Amino acid sequence: MNSSQNSTGGGKRRRSVWARRLNILGIVLIFGALVVVSMRSFVVESFNDARHKSFMAPAGKMFAPASGHFYFAAGSDTGARNEPVERIMNEIRKSKARFVLYVGDLVRYRNPSHFQWMAEEIDEKLGKTPLYAVPGNHEILSVNGVVDRSLYNEVFGPGYYWFSYGEVLFVGLDSSTSAYDDEQLQWLDKTLAKIRPQFKYCVIFSHVPPVNVKVPNDHRLFDESRDRFAEVIRNRGVNLLISGHVHYYSESEFAGVPLITLPSSGQPIRSEIKKFGYVMFKADRDGIAKIKPVYVEAGDDMEHWEAFMSSALVDEDINFFSVWVFCAGVVLLFGGKILRL
């Protein structure tokens, strides 16, 4: 009898221990889910109440520089790393650059709060220097791969457009899906035919390059778009192509036109030079010249928490995840109660 009683008592104690463990884990999961949902609601509300920043593209505008020459900067692929952006924007603000061409992936996630956070950062760090952008894949793709340009258009304006500065025509294109559709290529063809003759030089800037000199079959335009793009720009007076997406600096040529790909300014570096950077250019009567790529050190003071708060935390999938975690916690609580019976 004593042996049987001891065995029964030991079993009850073990069930009691496991019941307590399940109860504790269930409470932790429920509490964690409620905290995440509460934080998400607070962050969404705080960012939506923030001062809305807009960096609308100067579509069709014609700027006249005070002198015969001017400087401009070009950057790409920030992602969610605030610290390199701060250093790069500070460098540009102190330089002679009249404006910045940003060729995509300024953000990491496509949601209003993250766009707003990055816009606030740029406005604070860049000051009065204008930023003119074209979309990258991160601006138009959701986490599950759905293409939507509406948020980008609201903050930055059209995906493709032209403007001029002095004797230079700048044409921004939307290569965010690694392709150009018929409508955009027809627009480019008409722009080069009607607008290009009014200016001495022409620069085309876009996110995805037509070719990738390091990995020929990756991170470039799809074959059909690449070939059609070449047909449109060949022998049309285009003087320079500027792209990003590949996360390294390179100089090459496409369709008889010089092509420069920009270093990453925050996303993972794919270069022997383990630094983030941008490129400075000078335009004068002799043409458009690359001055130099400018690199900054990759420090450790990255504001990942702010980036997470404005991006991943406010993603709609967080709500579904929190519901599942909450339900799991409830199940564990009931499991613990059953074990006590």
Regions found by a protein language model. Give the residues of each.
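N-terminal active-site segment of His-dependent metallophosphoesterases
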Residues: 23, 33-117
